[in-house]
Amino acid sequence: MLLPSLICMLALSIEDIRSRRIPRLWVFSGAMVQLIVFVCWSLINADGRRLALCLVLALLSAAIQFLMAVIRPGMLGFGDVTCTAATGLAVGWLGLLPVLMWWCFMGILGLTAIGVAVLRMRHNTPGTTRQTQIPFAPVIASAAVLSCVIDAMSLLAV
Protein backbone atom coordinates (compact mmCIF):
# COMPACT_ATOMS: atom_id res chain seq x y z
CA MET A 1 0.00 0.00 0.00
CA LEU A 2 2.87 2.39 0.81
CA LEU A 3 5.27 1.06 -1.83
CA PRO A 4 5.14 4.15 -4.10
CA SER A 5 6.22 6.35 -1.19
CA LEU A 6 8.94 3.93 -0.14
CA ILE A 7 10.42 3.85 -3.65
CA CYS A 8 10.20 7.64 -3.91
CA MET A 9 11.79 8.18 -0.48
CA LEU A 10 14.65 5.83 -1.36
CA ALA A 11 15.33 7.63 -4.65
CA LEU A 12 15.11 11.07 -3.00
CA SER A 13 17.45 10.01 -0.19
CA ILE A 14 20.06 8.71 -2.62
CA GLU A 15 19.85 11.87 -4.73
CA ASP A 16 20.05 14.12 -1.66
CA ILE A 17 23.15 12.30 -0.40
CA ARG A 18 24.72 12.36 -3.86
CA SER A 19 23.97 15.94 -4.93
CA ARG A 20 22.35 17.71 -1.94
CA ARG A 21 19.25 18.43 -3.98
CA ILE A 22 15.74 17.01 -4.06
CA PRO A 23 14.14 16.99 -7.52
CA ARG A 24 10.63 18.38 -7.12
CA LEU A 25 9.42 16.39 -10.14
CA TRP A 26 10.36 13.18 -8.33
CA VAL A 27 8.55 14.34 -5.20
CA PHE A 28 5.45 15.32 -7.18
CA SER A 29 5.45 12.06 -9.16
CA GLY A 30 5.86 9.90 -6.06
CA ALA A 31 3.17 11.79 -4.18
CA MET A 32 0.73 11.57 -7.11
CA VAL A 33 1.21 7.81 -7.54
CA GLN A 34 0.75 7.31 -3.79
CA LEU A 35 -2.32 9.53 -3.82
CA ILE A 36 -3.83 7.51 -6.69
CA VAL A 37 -3.34 4.33 -4.65
CA PHE A 38 -5.06 5.93 -1.66
CA VAL A 39 -7.94 7.31 -3.74
CA CYS A 40 -8.51 3.87 -5.30
CA TRP A 41 -8.51 2.24 -1.85
CA SER A 42 -10.92 4.89 -0.57
CA LEU A 43 -13.30 4.38 -3.50
CA ILE A 44 -13.21 0.58 -3.22
CA ASN A 45 -13.84 0.70 0.52
CA ALA A 46 -16.25 3.65 0.38
CA ASP A 47 -14.27 5.42 3.10
CA GLY A 48 -12.93 8.90 2.46
CA ARG A 49 -12.14 9.75 6.09
CA ARG A 50 -8.75 8.07 6.04
CA LEU A 51 -7.85 9.85 2.80
CA ALA A 52 -8.91 13.20 4.24
CA LEU A 53 -6.91 12.59 7.42
CA CYS A 54 -3.73 11.70 5.54
CA LEU A 55 -4.07 14.80 3.35
CA VAL A 56 -4.53 17.04 6.39
CA LEU A 57 -1.60 15.46 8.24
CA ALA A 58 0.65 15.72 5.16
CA LEU A 59 -0.20 19.39 4.65
CA LEU A 60 0.22 20.14 8.35
CA SER A 61 3.60 18.41 8.39
CA ALA A 62 4.74 20.35 5.33
CA ALA A 63 3.52 23.61 6.89
CA ILE A 64 5.48 22.95 10.08
CA GLN A 65 8.60 22.09 8.09
CA PHE A 66 8.11 25.23 5.97
CA LEU A 67 7.87 27.38 9.11
CA MET A 68 11.07 25.82 10.42
CA ALA A 69 12.78 26.58 7.09
CA VAL A 70 11.59 30.20 7.19
CA ILE A 71 12.51 30.74 10.85
CA ARG A 72 16.03 29.36 10.35
CA PRO A 73 17.00 29.94 6.69
CA GLY A 74 19.69 27.64 5.37
CA MET A 75 18.96 24.75 7.70
CA LEU A 76 16.17 23.25 5.62
CA GLY A 77 15.52 23.80 1.95
CA PHE A 78 12.27 23.80 0.02
CA GLY A 79 13.14 20.31 -1.22
CA ASP A 80 13.03 19.11 2.38
CA VAL A 81 9.60 20.71 2.77
CA THR A 82 8.23 19.01 -0.35
CA CYS A 83 9.82 15.71 0.68
CA THR A 84 8.08 16.06 4.05
CA ALA A 85 4.74 16.63 2.32
CA ALA A 86 5.10 13.53 0.14
CA THR A 87 6.33 11.38 3.02
CA GLY A 88 3.65 12.78 5.31
CA LEU A 89 1.07 11.52 2.87
CA ALA A 90 2.22 7.93 3.45
CA VAL A 91 2.76 8.19 7.20
CA GLY A 92 -0.47 10.16 7.59
CA TRP A 93 -2.37 7.28 6.00
CA LEU A 94 -1.52 5.26 9.11
CA GLY A 95 -2.94 7.91 11.46
CA LEU A 96 -1.96 10.58 13.94
CA LEU A 97 0.17 8.42 16.28
CA PRO A 98 2.53 7.25 13.50
CA VAL A 99 2.88 10.89 12.37
CA LEU A 100 3.81 11.94 15.92
CA MET A 101 6.33 9.08 16.10
CA TRP A 102 7.70 10.14 12.71
CA TRP A 103 8.29 13.69 13.96
CA CYS A 104 10.01 12.39 17.11
CA PHE A 105 12.25 10.13 15.05
CA MET A 106 13.02 12.99 12.63
CA GLY A 107 14.14 15.06 15.60
CA ILE A 108 16.31 12.31 17.05
CA LEU A 109 17.85 11.29 13.72
CA GLY A 110 18.26 14.91 12.63
CA LEU A 111 20.11 15.84 15.81
CA THR A 112 22.25 12.71 15.43
CA ALA A 113 23.14 13.72 11.86
CA ILE A 114 24.07 17.22 13.04
CA GLY A 115 26.20 15.75 15.84
CA VAL A 116 28.05 13.49 13.41
CA ALA A 117 28.66 16.44 11.07
CA VAL A 118 30.02 18.55 13.94
CA LEU A 119 32.35 15.74 15.02
CA ARG A 120 33.60 15.34 11.45
CA MET A 121 34.31 19.08 11.26
CA ARG A 122 36.15 19.05 14.59
CA HIS A 123 38.37 16.22 13.47
CA ASN A 124 39.04 17.96 10.15
CA THR A 125 37.73 15.08 8.11
CA PRO A 126 38.60 15.71 4.45
CA GLY A 127 35.65 17.09 2.53
CA THR A 128 34.04 18.86 5.47
CA THR A 129 33.88 22.60 5.85
CA ARG A 130 31.93 24.99 8.00
CA GLN A 131 29.39 25.13 5.16
CA THR A 132 28.87 21.35 4.98
CA GLN A 133 25.20 20.64 4.39
CA ILE A 134 23.48 17.65 5.91
CA PRO A 135 21.21 15.72 3.56
CA PHE A 136 17.87 15.70 5.36
CA ALA A 137 15.82 13.50 2.98
CA PRO A 138 17.45 10.33 4.40
CA VAL A 139 16.46 11.52 7.89
CA ILE A 140 12.86 12.11 6.77
CA ALA A 141 12.74 8.73 5.02
CA SER A 142 14.40 6.75 7.83
CA ALA A 143 12.11 8.28 10.43
CA ALA A 144 9.08 7.44 8.28
CA VAL A 145 10.15 3.83 7.82
CA LEU A 146 10.77 3.48 11.57
CA SER A 147 7.35 4.86 12.47
CA CYS A 148 5.61 2.68 9.85
CA VAL A 149 7.42 -0.46 11.06
CA ILE A 150 6.58 0.27 14.70
CA ASP A 151 2.96 0.92 13.72
CA ALA A 152 2.84 -2.39 11.82
CA MET A 153 4.41 -4.24 14.76
CA SER A 154 1.84 -2.78 17.15
CA LEU A 155 -0.95 -4.00 14.85
CA LEU A 156 0.55 -7.50 14.83
CA ALA A 157 0.75 -7.53 18.63
CA VAL A 158 -2.98 -6.97 19.00
What is each of the regions a protein language model found here?
Residues 1-158:
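A membrane-topology feature that recognizes alpha-helical transmembrane segments
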